[in-house]
Amino acid sequence: MAHKKSGGSSSNGRDSESKRLGVKKFGGEKVLAGNILVRQRGTKFYPGSGVGIGKDHTLFALVQGAVGFVTKKHNRTYVTVTPAAQPAE
């Protein structure tokens, strides 16, 4: 039995693939219904009006309009989509 470990191998040197989380559409940006607004783990951001939430806590637009971020009670940040004004016909 060798009393010294052979050189040339490392027990470290691995990392997991990044998950590309974060805010995808920022305040004031125009979005279409179905656009992903935030990818997150848990509810760092909460859905406000015009925004839905997926089973993995992804926030997405339910309507076409402009994105907004609002901080309300309990220091919760809500993401909203304000519908674009419909042109008069």
Curated annotation (Swiss-Prot):
Keyword Ribosomal protein included in the entry's annotation? yes
Q: Which PANTHER family match?
A: LARGE RIBOSOMAL SUBUNIT PROTEIN BL27M, RIBOSOMAL PROTEIN L27
Q: Which residues form the signal peptide?
A: none
Write out the entry's keywords from A to Z. Answer: Ribonucleoprotein, Ribosomal protein
**Gene symbol of the encoding locus:** rpmA
Q: Where is this region: Disordered?
A: 1-21
Gene Ontology cellular-component annotations: cytosolic large ribosomal subunit
Q: One MF term in GO for this entry?
A: structural constituent of ribosome
Biological process according to GO? translation
Name used for this protein in its record: Large ribosomal subunit protein bL27
User: Which family does the record claim for this protein?
Assistant: Belongs to the bacterial ribosomal protein bL27 family.
Q: Which organism is it from?
A: Caulobacter vibrioides (strain NA1000 / CB15N)
Whether RNA-binding counts among this entry's keywords is no
